Amino acid sequence: MEEERVDSSKRLFRGIVADLRGRALCYKEDWVAGLRSGFGILAPTTYIFFASALPVIAFGEQLSRDTEGALSTVETLASTALCGVIHSILGGQPLLILGVAEPTVLMYVYLYNFAIGRPELGKQLYLAWAAWVCVWTALLLFVMAILNTADIINRFTRVAGELFGMLISVLFIQQAIKGMVSEFGMPKDEDSKLEKYKFEWLYTNGLLGLIFTFGLLYTALKSRKARSWRYGTGWYRSFIADYGVPLMVVVWTALSFSTPSKLPSGVPRRLFSPLPWDSPSLSHWTVIKDMGKVSPGYIFAAFIPALMIAGLYFFDHSVASQLAQQKEFNLKKPSAYHYDILLLGFMTLICGLLGLPPSNGVLPQSPMHTKSLAVLKRQLIRRKMVKTAKESIRKRETSSQVYENMQEVFIEMDKSPLAQTDPSVIIELQDLKEAVMKSNDEEREGDEESGFDPEKHLDAYLPVRVNEQRVSNLLQSLLVAGAVLAMPAIKLIPTSILWGYFAYMAIDSLPGNQFFERLTLLFVPTSRRFKVLEGAHASFVEKVPYKSMAAFTLLQIFYFGLCYGVTWIPVAGIMFPVPFFLLIAIRQYILPKLFNPAHLRELDAAEYEEIPGTPRNPLELSFRSNDSKRGVQEGDAEILDELTTSRGELKVRTLNLNEDKGNQIYPKEKVKAGDGDMSTTRE
């Protein structure tokens, strides 16, 4: 059996053929499901458009500065739109979002620095040589797809993914800092005699840049947490959480025009990019005619960076696709890793020949897309199930009939072209069945208020489902294409706002990164570790000894320093993906010898397992002997802060021992009114 599996994995084109067969069966349904959603599909479309377009605009400005205008925002937007349209129509996994990513920007900057240092290439043949790199990259991706290389994607474990994510976050911070510093200086190849480049105006531009950078960073981070605000309606908080970041970019851009009229026109400095119809933006479309001018030696030398880029794209594209198809999303349609790598090769080739930086699967936009479609699918299913349940209740049907009618609706809407009936659905709806059936028992006992109300109680029992379709990806890609034509408006954005956005992307990507969480734990003294347990925390905090966790984290820090250090090597920096490829062997053969296998499974778990916090008893401050036994050390000032308000008043704490009834329809232990007890203590 094992030999058959090995032989099967070695068959050429096996993965591509299987992917095409699987997706062909549901291709029509991919479009029908999107069109059937009506105007509801516009919500996830606009959400992903903003999440996709803003980073691409920022990367375009970074490329423009680091390649001295050879590439700009026009090219990054054009590549994202072109590849997005192709993938949404021909791609295997339509939930995957494509875009120009930071690794691509980094690679193209290395290629530029190499080209301008060679008289045979220079800036004039930079894009032509980059096109040859893309040709080699495409060929390598074709070979990977044909050889079924995507079978090894699961060997890239959490260690590799989180190290890579941390590297990108640090590079974002690095770019933000470099950008803020550059606001105090004069751009290259500019006339120093211009009014806006006098010292006082450069200094003013830098100070304004700091205000806009940190202003955007602070407001963007705050808006992302809007769902947990105590103020505003649910719709308002959801809107701010979903669209707050692009809204803050608009707000701070508008504020940048409120500066005094005596400031020169170039203060604050704004995004510099040629318009799509200007000659600098049109020249790269004909880069294919310059490819013949590249000498054969450099054509073959292009294979080396192509090898790095192909490996990087394989890793980045596959991981993005993997996270867009997490098992928690309960997707019904098959994956297409092998075919998508093949298609990525064709898109890389097209972009290279057009003088565009290639696009690949991006994070976190891809899982964000799936999540937004899960919300849409939930709304569609809920609406129909509530309508059916209300109709059954109005007809005074039994609880059994009410549940059967709702189950029938769910199964009908959950049908897949590949599996018309899924036996697991019955199991997933078991909690809903118990809730509906128990409501009948409660009504018989005369407790009508405890009856099942579909409007209030259905949400708690609906399984996760995703509206798997192609329309939202196509529409958001067309919107990105429209953004190319909106360049006159995009150029109004101050560059300092983009530096703030880089910092925002870095900080926003850290929560959930266990490497970062363990890094912060190293700075928590023994006497304060109980604070970590009071809040929600990853499972390794309780299951792995502190010494093992610290050793594993220190090893990651060392390896991260190695990866980051490679990016600083002038020409050899293009080899920075190599350490990540080596992690496959290190994780499989070396780490198991250094760490307990059980501990290693927790520290490098495939899933993010979180344990709820266990807050201390609110009265525990009155019993210091208990704390001393646990080694908890708190100063008198800290104790006093917990006992008093900011006005210096002693707090009166009321302990409520009643169980929280909330919106749960049937708590395990049902407490009747008056059974609880209230006790008040004065500290």
Swiss-Prot record:
Residues 1-38, 102-126, 182-200, 260-294, 357-477, 587-683 are cytoplasmic. GO terms for biological process: borate transport; cellular response to boron-containing substance levels; monoatomic anion transport. Residues 60-80, 148-160, 222-238, 316-335, 499-565 are extracellular. Coiled coil: none annotated. The keyword Mitochondrion does not apply. GO terms for molecular function: borate efflux transmembrane transporter activity; solute:inorganic anion antiporter activity. It is found in: Membrane. Induction: Up-regulated by boron supply. The keyword Cytoplasm does not apply. Gene3D superfamilies: Helical hairpin bin. One of its GO terms (cellular component) is plasma membrane. Pfam families: HCO3_cotransp. Residues 617-638, 661-683 are annotated as: Disordered. It is a multi-pass membrane protein. The chain crosses the membrane at residues 39-59, 81-101, 127-147, 161-181, 201-221, 239-259, 295-315, 336-356, 478-498, 566-586. Expressed in the distal sides of epidermal cells in the elongation zone of roots. InterPro entries: HCO3_transpt-like_TM_dom, HCO3_transpt_euk. Keywords: Anion exchange, Ion transport, Membrane, Transmembrane, Transmembrane helix, Transport. Efflux-type boron transporter polarly localized in roots. Boron is essential for maintaining the integrity of plants cell walls. Belongs to the anion exchanger (TC 2.A.31.3) family. This is Boron transporter 4.
